[in-house]
């Protein structure tokens, strides 16, 4: 039938190409992970990075709430609020700080260490002053490694697999990203959710699925909870909606989808 869609015939060469592509992505991710996780104790517990040192002090000053969500949202009395622990000049986002603090507490309570899963390492993780910064660096390294993978999917969504692979490969060996991933700061953590926001915006460009908008709002919310200067990312979803042709009741439905994204971001 000349009017029917053409059939896609996959050859053996195409499957080999796909397998090779998958192998290349794995190589890129292994390289990215190695460059980010190697040498995490680069200062030998001397706390040489000023921002990291301040965050470490805050982490040892706050501690997880025991009264559930009620105590968590009780700003005046919450044990997680740095302002209640003498750090009234705290200006960083709380999402990475809380994530690291809870993870460090879990490690301390469980006694878990890297050697328990066969990783030969001299790192001692926990919630103490000389331990929590290493937990924070692990979180930064993990977040930045994931950012490389997300960048691949962005390139693949907007262009093709090759562009995604090149973008991921360049990010994997980017000196600035590797450097930041070795610090317990909010940068690598927030960057992960910024890239996730870009990914879901790119997906929304080709599909008006509400899930993409909800995930964009979630990513935007966590990004802003890490660094408030990531707020302009919200303009991206507006550009996506404005790029669509007006069809029927599109403006109303598009507005509702953006309102959903904004509502989730504000809630987070």
Regions found by a protein language model. Give the residues of each.
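Hydrophobic core segments of transmembrane alpha-helices in multi-pass, intramembrane catalytic enzymes
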Residues: 55, 144-147, 190-198, 215, ...
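Short acidic/glycine- and proline-prone juxtamembrane loop motifs at membrane-interface regions
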Residues: 176, 182-190
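Membrane-interface transmembrane helices that cradle and orient dolichyl/undecaprenyl
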Residues: 162, 197-215, 223, 242-248
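Hydrophobic alpha-helical membrane-interfacial segments at the cytosolic entry of transmembrane helices
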Residues: 24-29, 214-215, 219, 234-237, ...
